[in-house]
Structure formats: C-alpha cells, structure tokens
Amino acid sequence: MNLIFGFVQLFLYHPLFLLLLYIYLVLFIPLKGAINITNIFPTLLKSIGIK
C-alpha cells in the first residue's frame, strides 16, 4: 500500500514523472517510430509474440 501511495504522490508532485516513464518505455522497448503512445501497443504484442 505504501508503495502505491508513494507512486501516486510522486506522480502528483512531479508531473514530468509520466514523461520520464514514457521515455523509459521508449528506451526499454526500442523501436524507430515511437512518437505517440499508440505505437507502443503493437510493439508489446510483437515482443510477446516473439517470446
């Protein structure tokens, strides 16, 4: 519970945390056309399909 509360508190006090999380996802899942969020879902499906 404390971890979830800390995460919500971090998000509320640091709005750029979501942007940093998005950048982390882009770096963690390397793809060339990761400009908008909609490109992440097909990539996740492809990575799951490969594994």
Swiss-Prot record:
**Source species taxonomy:** Eukaryota, Viridiplantae, Streptophyta, Embryophyta, Anthocerotophyta
Specify where it is mainly localized: plastid
**Residue ranges of the TM segments:** 10-29
Keyword annotations for this protein, in alphabetical order, are: Chloroplast, Membrane, Plastid, Transmembrane, Transmembrane helix
Subcellular location(s) per record:
Plastid, Chloroplast membrane
Give the membrane topology, semicolon-separated if more than one.
Single-pass membrane protein
Please report the name of this protein according to its UniProt entry. Answer: Uncharacterized 5.9 kDa protein in rps16-psbA intergenic region
Q: Which GO terms describe its cellular component?
A: chloroplast membrane
